[in-house]
């Protein structure tokens, strides 16, 4: 935990200059920047007196243009994505096909005769927001709280932080968008409850369940659809207009559809010289999409383990559509909080949090975040992350583990810190062993491991075996001996090696599962020796030798081929009636 040091200003003729920090909502469709003073939020306006700045980047005659609704759109969807993912995802490829540098080994886009990474491109949006704020506030702006989707992975978080850093920002905090929205509604003021945040923006849909305990926010469940938003509703309306009124599927027709949608949020009908459409027709057209979001929301609530909620918070301009509020109320019969402009709820929360972090007149006690992920080494050297980087503390996470081999009487736990996929690439924090376990078959032991970080950043790890009632607890300080520079180096290495690490992990998981397969079938063969002929045993042993050799080569393709060959040939042996082939890896 960090405590803000309070410095009393000296008695001089010059008033002490206040620090300034802004809140930024980097949205899929639009972005906003705001500043809070004495808990009153002022949203910075751009050229043309607009608060919503389209998150688009275009180059015209080598001049950078931000927010003209042309050029590259939906940059936010590209955070954390690899070149391979872009090429294999139709919707993502469509976003960047005109800019993609297919000759690069990593994801880069061609802009103004430059090859730029996503973070470098997104930085241009941050620079634009920063410039607008500095012009209006007549002050240098270097500190910011930035909102991110609750589902953002470490790579995506790293890229958005890098983009902000390139733009000249010191990122005080990354906070989840649902947390920011709840903060904007004042739910941080010693309130307790569970809130559902329904966020339907222009390009994405996210839903989160927040548990709030006296100012501590915890996202306990998330769900969503990264390819569903207000833009998809626009497409449905456009298609209807084209068919109904014999209009071309053009940008002009799309703008007409958007105008109709916006008008029908507060009127019963929309009419002009070209088209006419009423609210009932609109609701019939978009009902399947709205129903889809309700289903996702219900799934999220089920995942949270508790169906009870104290309120629904609406975020995103698309939630202005009355049908959405109606369907949410039908589904949950709960109070819907919508008195803050849904386009601005997230940035308002970010601005309020920014003020809370730097205001010198407040004796603020800040809740810290986990600087690097914490996890356990699994069999094969794989890291199982328990608490992810940037998780707010205090926090406690429980996971269950089991034994890999038969008759294990102890489990060794190796505690690690870092973002890499393999234990050898992470920082070792501590080791301990849970001893005296009853000898049982592999997989039957149930060891419950709890990672708990208190408000002072002290990590306590406890392991409890349910059958024997054996337990062990240790305390470690995850930040001991590691400074900010080392953290940055570890994050940079994780970013550079993300693709290789992921491939290595997949291979190791393949090997572990294959070794388990070999062990299980060898055990079955020993039990069935008297039922098999010598030729059958010879065939099976030859197949096993192929699999074992494939594992030794660490060739994932060869491993899969050897298993496939085994499954194919074993069908010709009577043992197939005893060994369930469906249990083999597909």
UniProtKB/Swiss-Prot annotation:
It holds the Pfam family HSP70. InterPro entries: ATPase_NBD, Heat_shock_70_CS, HSP70_C_sf, HSP70_peptide-bd_sf, Hsp_70_fam, ISC_FeS_clus_asmbl_HscA. GO terms for molecular function: ATP binding; ATP hydrolysis activity; ATP-dependent protein folding chaperone; unfolded protein binding. Coiled coil: none annotated. Keywords: ATP-binding, Chaperone, Nucleotide-binding. GO terms for biological process: iron-sulfur cluster assembly. Chaperone involved in the maturation of iron-sulfur cluster-containing proteins. Has a low intrinsic ATPase activity which is markedly stimulated by HscB. Belongs to the heat shock protein 70 family. NCBIfam families: PRK01433.1. PANTHER family: HEAT SHOCK PROTEIN 70KDA (PTHR19375). This is Chaperone protein HscA homolog.
């Amino acid at each position: 935990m960090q405590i803000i040091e309070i410095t009393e200003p000296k008695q001089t003729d010059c008033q002490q200059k206040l620090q300034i920090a802004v809140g930024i909502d980097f949205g899929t469709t639009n972005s906003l920047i705001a500043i809070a003073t004495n808990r009153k939020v002022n949203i910075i306006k751009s050229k043309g007196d607009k608060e919503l700045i389209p998150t688009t980047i275009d180059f015209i005659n080598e001049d950078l243009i931000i927010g003209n609704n042309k050029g590259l759109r939906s940059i936010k969807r590209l955070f954390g994505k690899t070149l391979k993912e872009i090429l294999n995802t139709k919707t993502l490829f469509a976003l960047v096909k005109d800019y993609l540098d297919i000759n690069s080994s990593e994801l880069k886009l061609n802009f103004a005769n430059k090859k730029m990474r996503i973070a470098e491109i997104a930085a241009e949006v941050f620079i634009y927001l920063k410039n607008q704020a500095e012009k209006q506030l007549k002050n240098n702006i270097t500190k910011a709280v930035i909102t991110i989707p609750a589902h953002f992975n470490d790579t995506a978080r790293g890229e958005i932080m890098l983009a902000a850093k390139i733009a000249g920002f010191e990122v005080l905090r990354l906070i989840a968008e649902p947390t920011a929205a709840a903060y904007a509604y004042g739910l941080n003021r010693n309130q307790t409850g569970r809130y559902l945040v329904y966020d339907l923006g222009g390009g994405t849909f996210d839903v989160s369940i927040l548990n709030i305990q006296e100012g501590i926010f915890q996202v306990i469940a998330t769900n969503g659809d990264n390819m569903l938003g207000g833009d998809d509703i626009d497409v449905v309306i456009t298609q209807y207009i084209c068919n109904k009124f014999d209009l071309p599927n053009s940008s002009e027709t799309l703008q007409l559809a958007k105008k109709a949608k916006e008008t029908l949020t507060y009127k019963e009908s929309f009419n002009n010289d070209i088209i006419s459409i009423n609210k009932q027709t609109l609701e019939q057209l978009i009902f399947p999409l709205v129903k889809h979001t309700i289903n996702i929301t219900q799934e999220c609530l089920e995942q949270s383990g508790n169906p009870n909620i104290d309120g629904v918070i609406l975020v995103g301009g698309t939630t202005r559509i009355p049908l959405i509020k109606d369907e949410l109320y039908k589904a949950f019969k709960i109070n819907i909080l919508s008195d803050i402009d849904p386009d601005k709820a997230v940035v308002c929360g970010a601005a309020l949090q920014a003020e809370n972090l730097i205001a010198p007149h407040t004796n603020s006690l800040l809740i810290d975040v986990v600087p690097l992920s914490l996890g356990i080494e699994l069999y094969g050297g794989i890291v199982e992350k328990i608490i992810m980087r940037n998780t707010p503390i205090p926090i406690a996470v429980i996971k269950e583990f089991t034994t890999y081999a038969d008759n294990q009487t102890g489990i060794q736990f190796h505690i690690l810190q870092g973002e890499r996929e393999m234990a050898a690439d992470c920082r070792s924090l501590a080791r301990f062993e849970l001893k005296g376990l009853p000898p049982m078959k592999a997989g039957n032991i149930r060891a419950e491991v709890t990672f708990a970080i208190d408000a002072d950043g002290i990590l306590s790890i406890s392991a409890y075996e349910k059958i024997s009632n054996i337990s062990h607890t240790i305390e470690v300080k995850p930040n001991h001996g590691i400074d900010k520079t080392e953290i940055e180096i570890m994050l940079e290495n994780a970013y550079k090696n993300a693709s290789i690490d992921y491939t290595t992990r997949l291979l190791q998981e393949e090997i572990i599962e294959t070794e388990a397969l070999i062990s299980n079938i060898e055990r079955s063969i020993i039990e069935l020796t008297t039922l098999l002929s010598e030729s059958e045993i010879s065939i099976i042993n030859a197949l096993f030798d192929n699999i074992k050799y494939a594992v030794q080569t660490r060739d994932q393709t060869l491993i899969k081929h050897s298993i496939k060959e085994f499954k194919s040939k074993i069908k010709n042996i009577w043992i197939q009636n005893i060994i369930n082939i469906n249990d083999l890896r597909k």
